């Protein structure tokens, strides 16, 4: 696979002019994984995404706020999930074997979602990452 740099303007016309890479067209099947602190509550109201748990709390979504208060306490901060996100049964080698057996040609892991929590020891995360949390490991690097 070769990558080439090209400048794009911050508008849809320019961004839409990007060609789809041939390898992506040929791959046909890949796996996308959303995994992070939002996996602790792993909950969202019907019709919403659990990955946007923090956004729901910040926006004042009454259903999400009620769920959060009932399950974690009204004053429990979202960042508190760093001490609860501890995937002790995470076996990245088994994941990789399963991906290969499935015929997937690529895997995309949300190594940092909208909440800013990193699944690797980023120097820019100010400690807000899996190595400094309960997991105590580089979840991205292990995969």
Language-model segments: which ranges?
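Mature catalytic domains of secreted/periplasmic carbohydrate-active enzymes
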Residues: 2-143
């Amino acid at each position: 696979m070769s990558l080439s740099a090209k400048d794009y303007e911050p508008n849809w016309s320019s961004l839409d002019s990007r060609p789809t890479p041939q390898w992506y067209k040929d791959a046909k099947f890949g796996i996308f994984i959303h995994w992070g602190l939002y996996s602790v509550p792993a909950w969202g109201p019907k019709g919403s995404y659990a990955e946007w748990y923090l956004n729901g709390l910040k926006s004042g979504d009454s259903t999400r706020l009620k769920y959060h208060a009932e399950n974690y306490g009204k004053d429990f901060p979202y960042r508190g999930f760093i001490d609860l996100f501890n995937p002790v049964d995470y076996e990245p080698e088994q994941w990789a074997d399963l991906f290969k057996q499935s015929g997937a040609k690529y895997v995309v892991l949300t190594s940092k979602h909208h909440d800013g929590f990193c699944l690797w020891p980023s120097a820019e995360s100010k400690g807000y990452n899996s190595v400094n949390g309960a997991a105590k490991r580089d979840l991205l690097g292990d995969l």
